[in-house]
């Protein structure tokens, strides 16, 4: 059984057949007459998929040629990317366009294209198109103020809390300057170090109420010397740590140890207990279980009492 192989008498000997039946050379650009045919068909309004089928050229090659023509106005290959000299040429043209925009921001894209041709920076054949110049100006942000004024929305957090954006940025910058010992400390997170006395006061307040009200926060602030923002942050982190450890306590309460009732509370915590409106005593507070369990951990050796 013999198979017929397709060979091409090409000087490079690299002829291949694509899925559409067209001949191409791997690593080589399409011939110039095929490129002209693609551009002329596109100008007539023919879709790229139909161009690909009629000329037997892959859809990716057709799209690449059309995109290059739309950006640079050139049909010849290697204008975008490829050799370093071509990249430097494109960068030089972009630099001239940006300089002209800075000197005369009122110039339109069509006037910039005519200016490039008049200054002999480009020719009519390789000058960038008007849409390409508009895209370059839009991407570089020429003529647009660099710092836009931030508008506070009526439903934003700043409006709800009554906090000014400028005050927040100023206070955060002041905290960074005051707490950073070195220049690169501003890139790190500012963490507050609490003393043992402050932690005792905070823990006692947390056992009494996991969501302290304004008066309680004010009294804690007077005792510890901390700001209310830091106190609220500490309580938030403390509640998160308790919620993270809560499944372990639930499993411990569900399994049980022995038939005799334990000496510590076994009430399963409910998510409703974490709400500020849920009033509970320190003994029934589920977040208080952590201190009870840490002080009297269950023994793994415990076994049910033998009936005698």
Swiss-Prot record:
Record-level GO BP terms: epidermal cell fate specification; gonad morphogenesis; hemidesmosome assembly; nervous system development; regulation of transcription by RNA polymerase II
InterPro entries (alphabetical): HD, Homeodomain-like_sf, Paired_dom, PAX_fam, WH-like_DNA-bd_sf
Cellular location(s): Nucleus
Transmembrane segments: none
Keywords: Developmental protein, DNA-binding, Homeobox, Nucleus, Paired box, Transcription, Transcription regulation
Classification via Pfam families: Homeodomain (PF00046), PAX (PF00292)
PAI subdomain, as annotated region: 16-72
SMART domains: HOX, PAX
Region (RED subdomain) location: 92-140
Cellular component, GO, one term: nucleus
MF annotations from Gene Ontology: DNA-binding transcription factor activity, RNA polymerase II-specific; RNA polymerase II cis-regulatory region sequence-specific DNA binding
Region feature (Disordered): 168-191
UniProt keyword Transcription regulation present: yes
Effect of gene knockout: RNAi-mediated knockdown causes embryonic lethality, vulval and gonad migration defects, and animals that survive have mild to severe body morphology defects. A marker of the lateral hypodermal (seam cell) fate, scm, is expressed ectopically in some P cell nuclei during the early larval L1 stage.
DNA-binding residues (ranges): 13-140, 187-246
Job description of the protein: Transcriptional activator. Regulates the lateral/ventral epidermal cell fate decision.
Family designation: Belongs to the paired homeobox family.
Record protein name field: Paired box protein 3 homolog
Lineage, broadest ranks: Eukaryota, Metazoa, Ecdysozoa, Nematoda, Chromadorea
